């Protein structure tokens, strides 16, 4: 099955690239990774299979300066390259940390290209932590509104809800790593359903039927062991703050 379904994960902007690099490091397999950024210095070290420096003439590879409009225009400047890397895919996940310039602005353009190319297009994004400021949150909310119009299914993970599950003494760097881990779980959870045989047979047609033009979706995480593990894990996932 993994050879039959073409799955690609596109990380947009610094947050999206950090997320896909974390996925690669943790061994998410059966997918192709694509990194997109306006900041060449942040793009080049990425572990992604494909890297696209968008808006070269507009930003000279120096980034979007936290301006989503620059991110959007840069993606439009490079739309032929973006279209090429998503064409032929069955499923395209588009991930970003909403609130910055490149991720917020480019993610809707990337998703639009993927959907036009015929892929099931799933957005998986985070909203900023409260300590990142109101401007970043406002940018994120505007970006999510635009993004939601371009994807089949959108999963939004509020970082402030995530932080309520973490140690109050956690460092900012570790908090961002935890956000990357949640993005990994969201994407791996769906891709594994498609590529990994299980006790209940779910094929790509089933997934597509549920997720095509589905709108907003929610995810929860639960873990358990022992005799009632399925019920306990299910209840934990349902009540998960994220």
Put a short name on every predicted segment.
Residues 1-242:
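Tubulin/FtsZ superfamily GTPase core signature
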């Amino acid at each position: 099955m993994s050879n039959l379904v073409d799955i690609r994960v596109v990380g947009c902007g610094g947050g999206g690239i950090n997320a896909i690099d974390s996925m690669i490091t943790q061994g998410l397999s059966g997918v192709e990774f694509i990194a997109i950024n306006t900041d060449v210095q942040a793009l080049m070290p990425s572990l992604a299979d494909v890297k696209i420096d968008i808006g070269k003439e507009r930003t000279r590879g120096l980034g979007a300066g936290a301006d989503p409009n620059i991110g959007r225009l840069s993606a439009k400047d490079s739309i032929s390259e973006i279209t090429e890397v998503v064409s032929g895919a069955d499923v395209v996940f588009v991930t970003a940390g909403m609130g910055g310039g490149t991720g917020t602005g480019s993610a809707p353009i990337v998703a639009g290209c993927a959907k036009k190319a015929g892929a099931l297009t799933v957005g998986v994004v985070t909203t900023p932590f409260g300590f990142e400021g109101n401007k970043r949150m406002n940018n994120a909310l505007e970006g999510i509104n635009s993004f939601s119009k371009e994807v089949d299914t959108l999963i939004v993970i509020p970082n402030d809800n995530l932080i309520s599950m973490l140690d109050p003494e956690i460092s900012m760097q570790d908090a961002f790593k935890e956000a990357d881990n949640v993005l990994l779980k969201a994407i791996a959870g769906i891709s594994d359903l498609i590529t990994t045989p299980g006790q209940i047979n779910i094929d790509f047609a089933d997934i597509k039927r549920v997720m095509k033009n589905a709108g907003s979706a929610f995810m929860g995480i639960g873990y358990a062991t022992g005799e009632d593990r399925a019920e306990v894990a299910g209840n934990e996932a349902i009540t998960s703050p994220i």
